[in-house]
Amino acid sequence: MPKVGMQPIRRQQLIEATLAAINDVGMHDASIVQIARRAGVSNGIISHYFRDKNGLLEATMRYLISHLGLAVKSRLLSLTENTPRARLRAIVQGNFDDSQTNSAAMKTWLAFWASSLHSPMLHRLQQVNDRRLYSNLCIEFSHCLPKDNARIAAKGLAGLIDGLWLRSALSHDAFNREEALSIAYDYIEQQLTRT
């Protein structure tokens, strides 16, 4: 019989083991056996908590998405200046948080994006995440720009965030947060100062 209170601990161990396995060998080669071994549990525990590998991958993506939301929220809550410019910058900072730009997270996100093209469940998660970013950016730009311009600016900044992140992930170099922030901030300034 499982110990009371072990479920959250085991789930976290398995999610962290999944991130580590994907970081080391990729999503395709990250087997249930390998993940269980890394977590120090039996294979059956994965089935018990997640049904199968797909359930574990979904939980891992939800974990990353949750940490992304927390990173953005914490930056928004810590703002001393509550302006659209400051809020846009906070959203960018949250998207470039270490929880999203460390090696394991970046490789898992890349694998997730590729898999979402073939998995309705992962595609749905990706769509929710994309819409949330776009909506948050659009709201902030709409405080300063006409509606159509705000939408275009939001699409541009969302694309820039994803593009900077993707180029770094594919380069195998550590994410250059300062450079990415500088580029994104410059874009925000260009959009907010358009006449």
UniProtKB/Swiss-Prot annotation:
Do you know which InterPro entries this protein is assigned to?
BetI_C, DNA-bd_HTH_TetR-type_CS, Homeodomain-like_sf, HTH-type_TetR-like_transc_reg, HTH_TetR, Tet_transcr_reg_TetR-rel_C_sf, Tscrpt_rep_BetI
**What is the recorded name of this protein?**
HTH-type transcriptional regulator BetI
- This chain's source organism reads Pectobacterium carotovorum subsp. carotovorum (strain PC1)
Q: Which residues form the HTH tetR-type domain?
A: 8-68
Name the Gene Ontology biological process terms. Answer: glycine betaine biosynthetic process from choline; negative regulation of DNA-templated transcription
Keyword presence, Cytoplasm: no
Which Pfam families does the protein's record reference?
A: TetR_C_6, TetR_N
Q: Which domain of life is it from?
A: Bacteria
Its organism's taxonomic lineage begins at: Bacteria, Pseudomonadati, Pseudomonadota, Gammaproteobacteria, Enterobacterales
One Gene Ontology molecular-function label: DNA-binding transcription factor activity
| Gene3D superfamilies, A to Z | Tetracycline Repressor, domain 2 (1.10.357.10)
Tell me the function of this protein. Repressor involved in the biosynthesis of the osmoprotectant glycine betaine. It represses transcription of the choline transporter BetT and the genes of BetAB involved in the synthesis of glycine betaine.
The record's NCBIfam families line, in alphabetical order, gives: betaine_BetI, PRK00767.1
**Which sections of the sequence are annotated for DNA binding?**
31-50
Sorted UniProt keywords: DNA-binding, Repressor, Transcription, Transcription regulation
- First and last residue of the signal peptide: none
Q: Pathway membership of this protein?
A: Amine and polyamine biosynthesis; betaine biosynthesis via choline pathway [regulation]
